[in-house]
Swiss-Prot record:
Keyword Magnesium recorded: yes
HAMAP family attached to this UniProt entry: Xni
Signal is among the record's keywords: no
Molecular function terms from GO: 5'-3' exonuclease activity; 5'-flap endonuclease activity; DNA binding; magnesium ion binding; potassium ion binding
Protein name, as recorded: Flap endonuclease Xni
Cofactor note: Binds 2 Mg(2+) per subunit. Only one magnesium ion has a direct interaction with the protein, the other interactions are indirect. Binds 1 K(+) per subunit. The potassium ion strongly increases the affinity for DNA.
Needed co-factor(s): Mg(2+); K(+)
Annotated ranges, domain 5'-3' exonuclease: 164-256
CDD domains with a match to the protein in the record: H3TH_53EXO, PIN_53EXO
Keywords on record: DNA-binding, Endonuclease, Hydrolase, Magnesium, Metal-binding, Nuclease, Potassium
Biological source species: Shewanella oneidensis (strain ATCC 700550 / JCM 31522 / CIP 106686 / LMG 19005 / NCIMB 14063 / MR-1)
Gene3D superfamilies registered for this protein in UniProt: 5' to 3' exonuclease, C-terminal subdomain (1.10.150.20), 5'-nuclease (3.40.50.1010)
């Protein structure tokens, strides 16, 4: 069975970079990233590996909602300047890259989903909780920095809702880190309480007459913003990838399947 290790490139690299005392020391960054990737291969024994990188195009999310991720600090100049050399170094280690047009998240989600549907196993290396919406028994997530799999029970306890309600929760409460608006006046706690009672957005919005007047008014006025927020948070899982598994085989290119994804 194929096991695809899918590394969220900037999620890994930027956190390693932040721990380096000298921001211009790209040699140390390259060494630490190489060690991290080698460790990932040693621990998880994948048949295939790829690092997925964000692209420079304006994402469809930004076009849909211009405030999306507004205010985020730009990539530090030394890192931006040294990124190509780092990617080339990984290629020399037989760790190939996939370059998204805009955001890597949708490419990662698509690659993981297609791998799972092809009866393979996908392991996403990222600290991004947004990947928890990929609820499939053959898709898992690994936090390299804490050296552990995403604990769904802990995540559900923290969010206050089931994993299957993640998108609905974000639609109501938003996500301040990504500037996802949610519904004004509905915070994470009240959103979780509503979803524990009504289970889904559809049921919630059809039950507004059963709520208090003030809360019902907030929800009614924020319905369109909830729909927008849901769309912004939802990962695309059906992008055309146009890649060949052979190119991402770990250490055994001559034995690779010629399957396309």
């Amino acid at each position: 069975m194929n096991k695809f290790l899918i590394i969220d490139g900037l999620n890994l690299v930027r956190r390693i970079y932040a721990a380096i005392p000298d921001e211009n020391d790209m040699e140390s960054l390259t060494e630490r990233v190489s060690v991290a990737c080698t460790k990932l291969l040693r621990i998880h024994h994948p048949t295939h590996v790829a690092v997925v990188w964000d692209g420079d195009e304006i994402s469809w999310r930004k076009q849909l909602y211009p405030d999306y991720k507004k205010g985020r600090k730009p990539m530090p100049e030394p890192l931006a300047a040294g990124l190509i050399a780092l990617q080339e170094h990984l290629q020399n280690l037989q760790i190939q890259s996939i370059y998204a047009a805009a955001e890597a998240d949708d490419v990662i989600a698509t690659l993981a989903t297609k791998t799972a549907k092809a009866q393979g196993e996908a392991l996403i290396v990222s600290t991004d909780k947004g990947f928890s919406q990929l609820n499939h028994p053959r898709i898992s997530q690994w936090d390299h920095f804490n050296q552990q799999y995403l604990n769904i029970a802990e995540l559900e306890q923290k969010l206050g809702v089931d994993r299957s309600q993640f998108l609905d929760l974000m639609a109501l409460a938003g996500d301040s880190g990504n500037k996802i608006p949610g519904i004004p006046g509905i915070g994470p706690k009240s959103a979780a309480e509503l979803l524990r009672t009504f289970r889904t957005l559809a049921t919630l919005f059809s039950s507004l007459p059963n709520l208090g007047a003030k809360q019902a008014k907030k929800l009614a006025e924020g319905r369109d913003m909830a729909r927008l927020s849901y769309k912004l948070v939802q990962l695309q899982t059906d992008l055309p990838l146009n890649i060949n598994l052979r190119d991402f085989r770990v250490n055994s290119p001559t034995k690779a399947s010629s399957n396309n994804l």
